Amino acid sequence: MLFLKKEREDKKGSFIMNKMKKNELINVKGIIIGIILFLLFYCSSYLQLIPILLFNIKEITGSTQVLLSLFSNTILLIILAIIFRKELIHEWKIFKDKFLANFDIGIKYWIIGLIVMMVSNTILTFVLKMGQAANEQEVQKLISYLPWIMVINAGIIAPCIEEIVFRKCYKNAFPNKWLFIILSSLVFGSMHVITSMTSPMDLLFIIPYGSLGASFAMMYQKTNTIYTSILMHMIHNTILIILSIIA
């Protein structure tokens, strides 16, 4: 009887602790790790100096730029995979065991995010008379150089990196559901705009990018596996790249 009573108390205590963790606004350790990895993400382009110096590359053509980006992104993904290897292995099991349910949730949230993204882009383009986002123009230019390498780089590798940096890191840093979704989507949207903006009005493009980022965050929150958002992010990017190739 004492054993059963103790077991019930342990379960009750565990339930309370888990509930408290979910209600926490921030995780200091998670924030510190997130800041370090965000800086690594932001400075990862410097990894391109390795092949530039190693092969004594004098001229950076469009094709060379794509290959250098592929190199730095691959190295960055390997580093992130090593850092989060335990969590990634655990979440892969969750994703695999409930694949159909996770995929169904992912599709639903992606469609919602896509609709909001398309509507906001339409308003920005036709109502506010704004052109295409500078980031989109830059990506399409890179696709024109080495299209199928871009399928690998922007369609497969980049989504893995971005989901780990903008979703996994933020979920670890901000246990509160809505704080995680709002902050991760805002930063995700900002990073796709600020790095290539040409005027202050370009900041409005944070809305379409951020809405898609919010859908990725919500599907991760719902399924508890980063692979759901990685898969949907891959599908989204790959479709856009292929459409750009055949257009």
State each model region's role:
Residues 81-91, 219-223:
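Structural signal for the C-terminal ends of transmembrane alpha-helices
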Residues 57-64, 89-158:
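Juxtamembrane helix-loop-helix connectors linking adjacent transmembrane helices
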Residues 46-57, 124-128, 193-197:
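Juxtamembrane "helix-exit" motif on the non-cytosolic side of transmembrane helices
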Residues 122, 126, 144-247:
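Transmembrane helix-loop-helix hairpins at the membrane interface
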Residues 2-4, 11-25:
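Short, Lys/Arg-rich, polar N-terminal cytosolic tail immediately upstream
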Residues 23-27, 31, 62-70, 98-107, ...:
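Hydrophobic, aromatic-rich alpha-helical transmembrane segments
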Residues 27-44, 109-116, 181-187:
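Alpha-helical transmembrane segments
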Residues 29-87, 135-137:
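Alpha-helical transmembrane segments in multi-pass membrane proteins
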